[in-house]
């Protein structure tokens, strides 16, 4: 399962939010997915050029206002969409103040630069496309949302 999402900070809740991109190139609607009404924060996000990307196979929590339960992602800016990393682990360690030696340059960038930019300056406009995968929603089977990131 993989899909691309638009990422932005919700300044009211101080939470990193993910919004699925819209339609496939053929303009075909997505079948079997119910989408809640967009919040004011989601509506404030500008239209994104990646609206042609597919969303087939996303779990239902991907459309939750709290965002997906768990996330594996990498930035499209680096042209590394095929090698996502588990951001939940990095975010948890960062929240606890733990430091580990990252195995890749990409992981180092995300941990030390991208999250810091989001925490201190807000959204980094060049880094908007992410790969979703490995969601706990399917494994745990719980309906309760899990906000995966709040800035310190």
Curated annotation (Swiss-Prot):
InterPro entries: Transactivation_prot_X. It comes from the Viruses. The keyword Signal does not apply. Keywords: Activation of host NF-kappa-B by virus, Activator, Apoptosis, Host cytoplasm, Host G2/M cell cycle arrest by virus, Host mitochondrion, Host nucleus, Host-virus interaction, Modulation of host cell cycle by virus, Transcription, Transcription regulation. GO terms for cellular component: host cell mitochondrion; host cell nucleus. Residues 68-115 are annotated as: Mitochondrial targeting sequence. The keyword Transcription applies. A fraction may be phosphorylated in insect cells and HepG2 cells, a human hepatoblastoma cell line. Phosphorylated in vitro by host protein kinase C or mitogen-activated protein kinase. N-acetylated in insect cells. Its main location: host cell. Disulfide bonds: none annotated. It is found in: Host cytoplasm; Host nucleus; Host mitochondrion. GO terms for biological process: DNA-templated transcription; symbiont-mediated activation of host NF-kappaB cascade; symbiont-mediated arrest of host cell cycle during G2/M transition; viral genome replication. May form homodimer. May interact with host CEBPA, CFLAR, CREB1, DDB1, E4F1, HBXIP, HSPD1/HSP60, NFKBIA, POLR2E and SMAD4. Interacts with host SMC5-SMC6 complex and induces its degradation. Interacts with host TRPC4AP; leading to prevent ubiquitination of TRPC4AP. Interacts with host PLSCR1; this interaction promotes ubiquitination and degradation of HBx and impairs HBx-mediated cell proliferation. Multifunctional protein that plays a role in silencing host antiviral defenses and promoting viral transcription. Does not seem to be essential for HBV infection. May be directly involved in development of cirrhosis and liver cancer (hepatocellular carcinoma). Most of cytosolic activities involve modulation of cytosolic calcium. The effect on apoptosis is controversial depending on the cell types in which the studies have been conducted. May induce apoptosis by localizing in mitochondria and causing loss of mitochondrial membrane potential. Belongs to the orthohepadnavirus protein X family. This is Protein X. It comes from Woolly monkey hepatitis B virus (isolate Louisville) (WMHBV).
